[in-house]
Amino acid sequence: MVQKFDFQELDLQGAYIITPFCATDNRGAFIKDYNIDTFKDNGINHDLKEVFYTISKKGVIRAIHFQLIKQQAKLVRCISGHVYDVIVDLRPESPTFGQWRGVHLTGENTKCVLVPERFGHGYLVVEDSIVSYKCAEVFYGEGDSGIMYNDPELAIEWPYDLIGGSDTVSYTHLRAHE
């Protein structure tokens, strides 16, 4: 069976949920979650400069993070496990400024989220997980910033019930190292 790329633009302009190319047979599966030409054919310019992975335990929240300089668009996919992935529009001129959207990413559904420049990004780890980031800009520690996961103005509705309640949360703000 072959599943072609599918691009679903969210109502936060420039953000997408992407179903990658996937070919399965009796041996297993082949998944391609990025192809520069396919992305460009769908109106998305996402040139890769850095790829990394995070490994997280159930109950961790990787809070809303972003870069103040050299904005970093990202293609995010859960390779294994399950995360509730959240993006936040941080563009003051945008009609959706301050709004957030969440989507369940799992190793099984293989969906990706394209996080545009000038957006915040974070996630709740529902199951022990490995998450892939394919970034259009390298990480600049001096420009790293974030918003608390429980910020009252954003009022993100994290699915705490999936991890046994909010008292089981372990907050972290990832500081990547080169």
Q: Where do the protein language model's features map onto the residues?
A:
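Non-catalytic, conserved peripheral segments adjacent to functional cores
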Residues: M1-E108, Y133-R175
